[in-house]
């Protein structure tokens, strides 16, 4: 009864109006699962391949019909007949079927859509929530959210090099309260921006994209919004985080961090050592708890220096640096580079490999942050993954745009379902820092 009988993919649109895949899986019993695949704007060069058609006459070359066909004509034939509950065997079969190290033949987007749909169909068959199916009955930790309330870099037209300015309600007693704190700061920030005559349009991830005078101006404005909303900045209230997305402004030939790419003429151009110094200055000046991709994805020496200098005080997250890949993570652990990994399911392409990366991180004392992509859908799978793995942190955008709110609302439902056993760790989510 739990045998897969049908697999079907179609092309749908993501939050940026670009095509992506939606996959449906059916079993003999009538159990059903659906998965939708996100897409990134700033992508690591080592990520699994997102297969696009390249036909400029259709969706500007971004169509996903090839990936859809790969699901319907190749993957479906290979996995029909499998027990839907055997996630690992199905994921491994798809990896073998593709046969490339980066899933470039079938496309990571094709494989991931099936992987998610299989998990959802299995949960439906067993009549349990997805987070319970994936993590077992002892899953009870709600993640502390990283809320991206100001967008810069590749996610907006704002003249700021850093891609994301985030707030984290680390002092909140519950997820529900933490979400409220974040929403109230978001609205306080909007009011402040309006009063300054700055634009309140939002970027890809729902954060504002105003023309600030620089990084410090962005942070100072967030601190004012926290105060205006009635909260305190710091460990008992709300802390700040950055996604520098440094690979987006790193000049490989000159080996410098060229802020002029986003901030224009007159902006800083920093060496690797100067980039570390600058980040340390910001940490000394502001209540910063997390920095993502502070160094370029290939600047291993820079990462090691940054970790040596700040690794006990601040969460240093590898996104483009690790691309949710256990091979790169293992090297980072060995060389003491970074102390946290960002988990993006479409960077690696299957749920099995995603869970392996989280497990490896935890065993090494690294934290794991489950994350969305800038091109999202209404699919809320990552909310369930965050709870299923007891990851403790989730990064899923701002407090606007339904593609972001869908994940927060799912977490509210899960907290409700868990009732009194639900836990929200807040500042304790950063278990590898000296707090």
UniProtKB/Swiss-Prot annotation:
GO terms for biological process: glycolytic process. It catalyses: (2R)-2-phosphoglycerate = phosphoenolpyruvate + H2O. Binds a second Mg(2+) ion via substrate during catalysis. It is found in: Cytoplasm; Secreted; Cell surface; Secreted, Cell wall. SUPFAM superfamilies: Enolase C-terminal domain-like (SSF51604), Enolase N-terminal domain-like (SSF54826). Changing residue 434 to L: No effect on catalytic activity; significant decrease in the ability to bind Glu- and Lys-plasminogen. One of its GO terms (cellular component) is plasma membrane. Coiled coil: none annotated. Transmembrane segments: none annotated. Mg(2+) binds at residues 243, 292, 319. Homooctamer, a tetramer of homodimers. HAMAP family: Enolase. Belongs to the enolase family. PANTHER family: ENOLASE (PTHR11902:SF1). Catalyzes the reversible conversion of 2-phosphoglycerate (2-PG) into phosphoenolpyruvate (PEP). It is essential for the degradation of carbohydrates via glycolysis. 'Moonlights' as a plasminogen receptor. Binds plasminogen and more weakly plasmin when expressed on the bacterial cell surface; probably has more than one plasmin(ogen) binding site, may bind via Lys residues. Plasminogen binding potentially allows the bacterium to acquire surface-associated proteolytic activity, which in turn contributes to tissue invasion and virulence. This is Enolase. It comes from Streptococcus pyogenes serotype M6 (strain ATCC BAA-946 / MGAS10394). The lineage of its organism: Bacteria, Bacillati, Bacillota, Bacilli, Lactobacillales.
């Amino acid at each position: 009864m739990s045998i897969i009988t049908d697999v079907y993919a179609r092309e749908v649109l993501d939050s940026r109006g670009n095509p992506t895949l939606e996959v449906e899986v059916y079993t003999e019993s009538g159990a059903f699962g659906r998965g939708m695949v996100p897409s990134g704007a700033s992508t690591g060069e080592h990520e699994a391949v997102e297969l696009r058609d390249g036909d400029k006459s259709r969706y500007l070359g971004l169509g996903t019909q090839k990936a859809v066909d790969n699901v319907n004509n190749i993957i479906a034939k290979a996995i029909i007949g499998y027990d839907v509950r055997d996630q690992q065997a199905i994921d491994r079969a798809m990896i073998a079927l593709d046969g490339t190290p980066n899933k470039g033949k079938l496309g990571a987007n094709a494989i991931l859509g099936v992987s998610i749909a299989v998990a959802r169909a299995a949960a439906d068959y067993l009549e349990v929530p997805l987070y319970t199916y994936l993590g077992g009955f002892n899953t009870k930790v709600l993640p502390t959210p990283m809320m991206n309330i100001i967008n810069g870099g590749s996610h907006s037209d704002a003249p700021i090099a850093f891609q994301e300015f985030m707030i984290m309600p680390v002092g909140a007693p519950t997820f529900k309260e933490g979400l409220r704190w974040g929403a109230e700061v978001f609205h306080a920030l909007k009011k402040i921006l309006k009063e300054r005559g700055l634009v309140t349009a939002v970027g890809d991830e729902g954060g504002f994209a105003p023309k600030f005078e620089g990084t410090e101006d962005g942070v100072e404005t967030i601190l004012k919004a926290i105060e205006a909303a009635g909260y305190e900045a710091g460990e008992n209230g709300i802390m700040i985080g950055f996604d520098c997305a440094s690979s987006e402004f790193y000049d490989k030939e000159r080996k410098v961090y060229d802020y002029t790419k986003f901030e224009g003429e007159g902006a800083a151009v920093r060496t690797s050592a100067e980039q570390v110094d600058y980040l340390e200055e910001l940490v000394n000046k502001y209540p910063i708890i997390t920095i993502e991709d502070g160094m370029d994805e290939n600047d291993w020496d820079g990462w090691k220096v940054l970790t040596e200098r700040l690794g006990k005080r601040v969460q240093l997250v590898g996104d483009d640096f690790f691309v949710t890949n256990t091979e790169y993570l293992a090297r980072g652990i060995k060389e003491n580079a970074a102390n946290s990994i960002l988990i993006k399911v479409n960077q690696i392409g299957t749920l099995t490999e995603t869970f392996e990366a989280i497990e490896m991180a935890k065993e090494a004392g690294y934290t794991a942050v489950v994350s969305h992509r800038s091109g999202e859908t209404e699919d809320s799978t990552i909310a369930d993954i965050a709870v299923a793995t007891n990851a403790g942190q989730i990064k899923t955008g701002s407090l606007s745009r339904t593609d972001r709110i869908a994940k927060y609302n799912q977490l509210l439902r899960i907290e409700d379902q868990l009732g009194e056993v639900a836990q929200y760790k807040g500042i304790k989510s950063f278990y590898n820092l000296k707090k």
